[in-house]
Amino acid sequence: MVTIVWKESKGTAKSRYKARRAELIAERRSNEALARKIALKLSGCVRADKAASLGSLRCKKAEEVERKQNRIYYSKPRSEMGVTCVGRQKIKLGSKPLI
């Protein structure tokens, strides 16, 4: 009697590519985290020092938003300024206002 042994599937090219990318990203993240830790130790900064040194960011005023001056034309017509267009009904011998 013959026994058939199936090999494990290596997966598709896309899954292998994604696995390689995941390994590279994980390695890069660990390297960046280690580099940040080393830089922090070398600089001797603590969170409190960083917060105190960023006083300019705390005192920074919020930017004012520019507002449109012609807003009254687009609001509900309370006066004649609110009417921005006039409609006309065209017929064979002339045009009549829609009012």
From Swiss-Prot:
Keywords: Transcription, Transcription regulation, Transcription termination
Coiled coil: none
One of the protein's GO biological processes: DNA-templated transcription termination
Hydrolase is among the record's keywords: no
Keyword Nucleotidyltransferase set for record: no
Covalent S-S links between cysteines: none
Comment field (misc): Protein N is an immediate early function essential for all other phage vegetative functions.
Function as written in the Swiss-Prot or TrEMBL entry: N protein regulates the transition from the early to the middle stage of lytic development.
Name used for this protein in its record: Probable regulatory protein N
Organism annotation: Enterobacteria phage phi21
Gene coding for it: N
